């Protein structure tokens, strides 16, 4: 796992800025499963995250394509900023890239402490990885609309 100084400074700034902001906030990021992590750790990540997210009031959706993670999560500013920092430090994730972060008027995934699905199209997440800001959110939302997620 490697981060340049700008990424670390940006993450620190985001964390500090979101600590005391009221309302909901969201993060959308992509990362890769570390080469030395067996694919079975993904089930462990999902199970542990569901429990932890429920305690912290975080909701969201995790998509995995066999190599890439893409996740959108939402909750209080302090909680989602802390979660993003834990993900950045998690050795099972590499090449963590924040595609979007900011205030959120209404939760998108209020039904799930962590919804999880996999996709077979490995290029879908790779294409998303190149986007930032609202374009990334719109592409992610469009991808989610095409997934078979249980109600």
Model-derived segments and spans:
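Charge-rich, low-complexity N-terminal segments
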Residues: 2-151
């Amino acid at each position: 796992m490697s981060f340049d100084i700008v990424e670390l400074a940006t993450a620190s700034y985001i964390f500090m800025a979101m600590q005391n902001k009221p309302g909901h906030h969201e993060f959308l990021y992509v990362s890769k499963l570390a080469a030395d992590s067996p694919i079975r750790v993904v089930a462990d990540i999902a199970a542990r995250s569901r429990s932890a997210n429920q305690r912290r009031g975080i909701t969201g959706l995790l998509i995995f394509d066999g190599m890439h993670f893409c996740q959108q999560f939402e909750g209080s500013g302090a909680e989602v900023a802390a979660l993003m920092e834990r993900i950045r430090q998690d050795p099972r994730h590499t090449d963590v890239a924040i595609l979007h972060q900011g205030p959120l008027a209404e939760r998108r995934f209020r039904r799930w402490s962590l919804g999880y699905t996999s996709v077979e199209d490995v290029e879908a997440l790779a294409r998303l990885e190149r986007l930032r800001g609202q374009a990334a959110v719109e592409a992610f939302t469009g991808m989610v609309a095409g997934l078979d997620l249980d109600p």
